[in-house]
Amino acid sequence: MIKTWIRCLTTEVRYHQPNAHGRSLVMSVLNSTVTKREAKDYLNKYTDENNHHYCLVFLRHLSEYSDNVLSGFSKTVSRIQTLGLRPILIVDPLCQDISYQSQRLDNHLHDQSLKSIIVLDPITIGERGSIDVKLPILNPHIIPIIEPYQYHEKEAFKKLAGDPSRFLSSLVSNLPINIDKVFLISKYGGLPSVERHTNSHVFVNLSQEYRELRNSYQNQLEKLESIQVDNTEKNLVESLQLFLNQDKILSNSDQLKCHMEDLEIMNKTLSVLPHSSTGLITTILAGSKLSDNNPLVYNILTDRSLISSSLPRFKRSAAAQSKSWYELPSSNVEEEVTSANDSVLVTTVFKKGIDIHIFDFRTLTDDNSIGLPPSQATQTGKSDPVSKKLDLNKLNGIINSSFKRSLDLSHYLGRINGNIASIIVIGDYEGIAILTYEGPKDKQFVYLDKFAVAQKLKGSLGISDIIFNLMFRKFPHELIWRSREDNVVNKWYFQRSTGVLHLSLDLGNDDQKQSIFKLFYYGNPESESFHNVERLRDYAKYVRDITPSWHK
């Protein structure tokens, strides 16, 4: 401890210009992994010397990592600092021999020429329950290593924090600094997803998914625990199998409990931070990578996951093994793709999330919407005064600003009203999707008629991914949309589709028209409809002939 203070106090307090290695790191990563928009956002945010940005790194299972592993991770901490964030390392209250592990971590940081200081009791609990956080952040290049203790004035005694999520949220809510990132390092990696064959969820929108995930893990845990307890009416073979699998059952239970704690940590911590803050869970091996697909470094630069969460499941495996996908960074390091070492498979990104409203009115009326044009005004007498109404004024506004054209709302509603499949609204109309029923009366299909995201939020918060995920879950078997042939987003659309058709093609029986659109369709590629020429002809004909509703 004395050596740590000597190192910190003898460090000159001044601004450190990035060295050649630092500049090279920033430029190489910017050139290889991010879009122009992301590069601009990163440079605007993290190269301003007057604004200080911090990231919390919560280390679980610290005692289980070898010195070689910790040495590799210390290099990532150095990269985080070089990229403009000030890391604050926090030791898990459940860690064995906290003092020794903190000193061990401190030594590895020092070996990387990093300056760190161990903070023994960062939180003081007053006699009346007040919380005071004291964190000696001496200069941009001194890294605090926080031990999970709280000093209680009433008892005049230092206690180990019991609940990691409460400790972290108390710490964060009382720190007067800008915390942009919350990184959690766990030997188990991100939260497991059934849809991804127990590989990690790519992205979690907590306001939408927290409760569902918590209940799912709780149900799985109860099933595992019931297997251990229920020995009644088991024959000798079943009892023997249970005995032989006991260690595996206990291991799975421990892992599930850890994932539930990680989910709680992210939910409580991000709930007291701004909406712009991002959480991320990964393994220490993934977080130690020196290649471009280090999920911590990548998220600092892009504020997103290594791969898009809205990629269809049948494309994710291909994307994980191919570097040609738009969302995947290139890497000079060729590695065998396995769940143990592939960053994509062990990383989950979190956002506090934004409100989502889904309106499933087939027909819009004055009872369920606001701003209905006079030509469409009707009342059913079935109004629910509690239910939220669709605001057509705001809906029209985001469509106009996103498409940079003026929608003829009366003409548009005249076409879709009575055939609405669903309308999805994100936040305060910061993202929307309008889905309609199109096609033959006896066999209609769902068509994404309008999709818009506010200009200020394009490429951020994962809004596009959230909308597409919602649509894919709601209409998993058949979903169609079209896009202009010169639309720069078409590559993104292609990755989320099962197939693409040019709408200028000859549909047979002399049915051919010039069209500026491509048709994209989504669903199970093994489904009969996607191998049925007549069904594909229906898609093309009805989507091609939809009349636009823009003011001229």
From Swiss-Prot:
Q: Extract the transit peptide range from the record.
A: 1-32
UniProt GO cellular component terms: mitochondrial matrix
Location of the protein in the cell: Mitochondrion
Query: Record's PROSITE patterns?
Result: GNAT_NAGS (PS51731)
Keyword Signal carried by entry: no
Q: Which domain of life is it from?
A: Eukaryota
Which pathway does UniProt place it in? Amino-acid biosynthesis; L-arginine biosynthesis; N(2)-acetyl-L-ornithine from L-glutamate: step 1/4
Q: Which residues form the N-acetyltransferase domain?
A: 379-545
Biological-process GO terms, alphabetical: L-arginine biosynthetic process; ornithine biosynthetic process
| Swiss-Prot/TrEMBL catalytic activity | L-glutamate + acetyl-CoA = N-acetyl-L-glutamate + CoA + H(+)
Major localization class: mitochondrion
Q: Short name of one Pfam family for this protein?
A: NAT
- InterPro entries listed in its UniProt record: GlcNAc_Synth_fun, Vertebrate-like_GNAT_dom
Enzyme Commission identifier(s): 2.3.1.1
- GO MF term list: L-glutamate N-acetyltransferase activity
Any idea which UniProt keywords this protein has?
Answer: Acyltransferase, Amino-acid biosynthesis, Mitochondrion, Transferase, Transit peptide
Tell me its family: Belongs to the acetyltransferase family.
User: According to its UniProt entry, what is the function of this protein?
Assistant: N-acetylglutamate synthase involved in arginine biosynthesis.
PANTHER family noted in UniProt: AMINO-ACID ACETYLTRANSFERASE, MITOCHONDRIAL (PTHR23342:SF4), N-ACETYLGLUTAMATE SYNTHASE (PTHR23342)
Write the protein's name: Amino-acid acetyltransferase, mitochondrial
Encoding gene, per UniProt annotation: ARG2
